[in-house]
């Protein structure tokens, strides 16, 4: 397989065609969706079932009845008997109430840029259905059921990456989903189980008629944070996978550098008991346990080695203190995104019990904008930390005697080892750090006739986080390649052969062997991963590893124990 094909595979891993996974069912409407459930529906085709709770169904119908009565009695309600946004002073008659909703789709059909991944759109659809089942939106059950049908049949509307400022929700992106659901016009297109077609044809194949929106329904569908939150949910999941892999990379790097295990002694971290620091230290303690490639100093003694430092440099010694805040931050981000996932985010909201509606602002995606800004910042920190470890590995004066640039066959004088690979990584790390800059504070105050004069930029922030995650996967591939080569060379320096499996800790052997299998490296004691520069294509190896990570393959499975532990923090 050539490099182009491998890169296309990476792209397709986020454009996952519908694959029906009937092993489980995700029930929507009980207000307890998790990120894992969103990912299972979005990427793996897990079937969706709307709750059959009678109270929920009655609430949905009661909210519709309230809206219909309000229209009949000409009650002043935003977006139902009034115009939108800065034109909310326009009075809408009973005869125009339904047309207003359809017209909302048309004037919002203004997206630009590339299409979102199918997985991110599917996540958005799931969350929109979940929000509407609260019974505060004034939308028919039939329309919510249509979302369920689309998800279970693998019909995914095409949505564009630009168009939402995250203020009145994701108006423009959701207009594409709504237009496709009701079959408004052939210009709305979908992916139908891997095939592109217009939404009208898709409805026909599903045996569904076109739908005419009723009062409030267009606004209910388009006025909410579901798209940005769906993207965010997928990104949080991916970031946790990458954080687990980061721990594995550091464990390989520490063993490659012949670092000490003393830095992770429980006593140190009990003296500064931040939850994330404790978790990180405990995980690294476990990852390094029984390794022959670390200095065994858990007894508190310090091995003095002449000209070498008596203690490790900060990137090793302070690892738990550096990554700990990120672990705590990701845990908080997870909680906030899951609250947003299980919220009602349109406007106005209907209190059916008290027969009153309220004008509010739950559509503002500030929680998503701020959390995604934070997540990108954390990714930048993780990448910079790994970059420092790589710099130590390639420099003999800092690596405890490994060859320069981790050259495999030093007898072949033209070999430059992983010099080019480091440069490639150096080109990625600054970009990830740059992407860590915030967007939520860069909003236009004049948006939509100064009506949306504060806005979250949550949608763009979530999309940029998706980009950051994708790039970090490539960087992680590079880091893993360095880790494998380093432990091979360290094994040779200490044992006279290159089979690192005999020296690595039991908890890192699986990651090592997974990387070797993905890139096609023979497990041998005769040669390290990279022997001569001209015997492999490093770009193909980057692509193979990146694709494996994106698809949740062998490499991700090798750190499942870390990932599972991380999810419980």
Swiss-Prot record:
GO terms for MF: phenylalanine ammonia-lyase activity
Mod. after translation: Contains an active site 4-methylidene-imidazol-5-one (MIO), which is formed autocatalytically by cyclization and dehydration of residues Ala-Ser-Gly.
Catalyzed reactions: L-phenylalanine = (E)-cinnamate + NH4(+)
Source organism, top-level taxon: Bacteria
Compartments, record wording: Cytoplasm
EC number annotated for this UniProt entry: 4.3.1.24
GO biological process, one term: cinnamic acid biosynthetic process
Record field: pH dependence: Optimum pH is 7.7-8.5.
Keyword Lyase: yes
SUPFAM superfamilies per record: L-aspartase-like
Active-site residue list: 78
Keywords: Cytoplasm, Lyase, Phenylalanine catabolism, Phenylpropanoid metabolism
Chief place of localization: cytoplasm
Membrane-spanning residues: none
5-imidazolinone (Ala-Gly) cross-link, chain position(s): 167-169
Binding site for (E)-cinnamate: 223, 311, 317, 347, 419, 448, 451
Modified residues (2,3-didehydroalanine (Ser)): 168
UniProt pathway annotation: Phenylpropanoid metabolism; trans-cinnamate biosynthesis; trans-cinnamate from L-phenylalanine: step 1/1
GO cellular component: cytoplasm
Family affiliation: Belongs to the PAL/histidase family.
Record note on quaternary structure: Homotetramer.
Function: Catalyzes the non-oxidative deamination of L-phenylalanine to form trans-cinnamic acid, the first step in the phenylpropanoid pathway.
Protein name, UniProt field: Phenylalanine ammonia-lyase
Organism field: Nostoc punctiforme (strain ATCC 29133 / PCC 73102)
């Amino acid at each position: 397989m050539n490099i182009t094909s491998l890169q296309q595979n990476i792209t397709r891993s986020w454009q996952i065609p519908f694959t029906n996974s009937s092993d489980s069912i995700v029930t929507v409407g009980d207000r307890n969706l998790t990120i894992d459930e969103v990912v299972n529906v979005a990427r793996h085709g897990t079937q969706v079932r709307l709750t059959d709770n009678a109270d929920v169904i009655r609430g949905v119908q009661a909210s519709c009845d309230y809206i219909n009565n309000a229209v009949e009695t000409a009650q002043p309600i935003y977006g139902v008997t009034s115009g939108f946004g800065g034109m909310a002073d326009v009075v809408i008659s009973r005869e125009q109430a339904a047309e207003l909703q359809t017209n909302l789709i048309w004037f919002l059909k203004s997206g630009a840029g590339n299409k979102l991944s199918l997985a991110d759109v599917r996540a958005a659809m799931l969350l929109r259905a979940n929000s509407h089942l609260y019974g505060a939106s004034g939308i028919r059950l039939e329309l919510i059921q249509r979302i369920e049908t689309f998800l279970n049949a693998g019909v995914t509307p095409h949505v564009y990456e630009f168009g939402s400022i995250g203020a009145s929700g994701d108006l423009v992106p959701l207009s594409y989903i709504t237009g496709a659901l009701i079959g408004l016009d052939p210009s709305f297109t979908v992916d139908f189980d891997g095939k592109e077609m217009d939404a009208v044809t898709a409805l026909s194949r599903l045996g569904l008629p076109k739908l005419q929106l009723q009062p409030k329904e267009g606004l209910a569908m388009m006025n909410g944070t579901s798209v940005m939150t769906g993207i965010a949910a997928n990104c949080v999941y991916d970031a946790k996978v990458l954080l687990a892999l980061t721990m594995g990379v550091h464990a390989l790097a520490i063993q490659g550098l012949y670092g000490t295990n003393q830095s992770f002694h429980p006593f140190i971290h009990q003296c500064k008991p931040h939850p994330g620091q404790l978790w990180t230290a405990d995980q690294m303690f476990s990852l390094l346990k029984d390794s022959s490639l670390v200095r065994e100093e858990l007894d508190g003694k310090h091995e003095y080695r002449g000209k070498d430092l008596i203690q490790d440099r900060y990137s090793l010694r302070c690892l738990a203190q550096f990554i700990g805040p990120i672990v705590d931050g990701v845990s908080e981000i997870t909680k906030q995104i899951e609250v947003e996932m299980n919220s009602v985010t349109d406007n106005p909201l209907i209190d059916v019990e008290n027969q009153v509606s309220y004008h509010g602002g739950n559509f503002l995606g500030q929680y998503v904008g701020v959390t995604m800004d934070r997540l990108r910042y954390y990714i930048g920190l993780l990448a910079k930390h790994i970059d420092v470890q790589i710099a130590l590995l390639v420099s003999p004066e800092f690596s405890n005697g490994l060859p320069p640039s981790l050259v495999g066959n030093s007898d072949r004088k033209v070999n430059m080892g992983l010099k080019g690979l480091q440069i490639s990584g150096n080109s990625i790390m600054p970009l990830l750090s740059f992407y860590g800059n915030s967007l939520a504070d860069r909003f236009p105050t004049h948006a939509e006739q100064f009506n949306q004069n504060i806005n979250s930029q949550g949608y763009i922030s979530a999309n940029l986080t998706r980009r950051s995650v994708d790039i970090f996967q490539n960087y992680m591939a590079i880091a893993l390649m360095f880790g494998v080569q380093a432990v091979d060379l360290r094994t040779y320096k200490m044992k006279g052969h290159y089979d690192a499996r005999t020296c690595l800790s039991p908890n890192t052997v699986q990651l090592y062997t997974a990387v070797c299998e993905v890139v096609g490296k023979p497990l041998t004691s005769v040669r390290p991963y990279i022997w001569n520069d001209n015997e492999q294509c490093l770009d193909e190896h980057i692509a193979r590893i990146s694709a494996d990570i994106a698809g949740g393959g062998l490499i991700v499975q090798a750190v499942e124990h870390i990932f599972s532990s991380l999810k419980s923090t």
